[in-house]
Amino acid sequence: MLSPEAERVLRYLVEVEELAEEVLADKRQIVDLDTKRNQNREGLRALQKDLSLSEDVMVCFGNMFIKMPHPETKEMIEKDQDHLDKEIEKLRKQLKVKVDRLFEAQGKPELKGFNLNPLNQDELKALKIILKG
C-alpha cells in the first residue's frame, strides 16, 4: 500500500503522461495528414502538367490503381485537399488546448504568443496604410 503522498505523486505523473500522449498523438496525426496533403498536391501538379483532358488517368487508392476521367480525378483530389485542410486546422486548434492543459498540469506558465491568429486581408491592408501614413 502506498502512502497518500506517493499516491498523489503517482496520480500527478499519470495525468501528465496521459496529457503528453494526447499531444504527441495529435502531432503525429497532423504530420500524417500533411504528408497526404503533399501527395495530393503532387498529384494535382501532375494533372495540371498533363494537358490531355480527354484521356483517363490512373489513380492509386491504397494498393489498387483505378482508371478515372481527368476532370473527375482533379475534382476529387481538390475536395480531399479541402477536407484535409479543415481537419489539420481542427487538430491544430485542439492541440493548442491540449498543450495549455499539459503546461497547466506541469505548473509551467502559459506560452506567450501561442494563441495568436494571422491577420486577414482587410486588417493587413489597414496596417499597411497606418504604417505608410
Curated annotation (Swiss-Prot):
One GO BP: protein folding
Single GO MF annotation: unfolded protein binding
Pfam family name, one: Prefoldin_2
Subcellular location: Cytoplasm
Domain of life from the UniProt record: Eukaryota
Keywords: Chaperone, Cytoplasm
GO cellular component: cytoplasm; prefoldin complex
Subunit composition and interactions: Component of the PAQosome complex which is responsible for the biogenesis of several protein complexes and which consists of R2TP complex members RUVBL1, RUVBL2, RPAP3 and PIH1D1, URI complex members PFDN2, PFDN6, PDRG1, UXT and URI1 as well as ASDURF, POLR2E and DNAAF10/WDR92.
Family: Belongs to the prefoldin subunit beta family.
Purpose: May play a role in chaperone-mediated protein folding.
Protein name as annotated: p53 and DNA damage-regulated protein 1
Source organism: Pongo abelii (Sumatran orangutan)
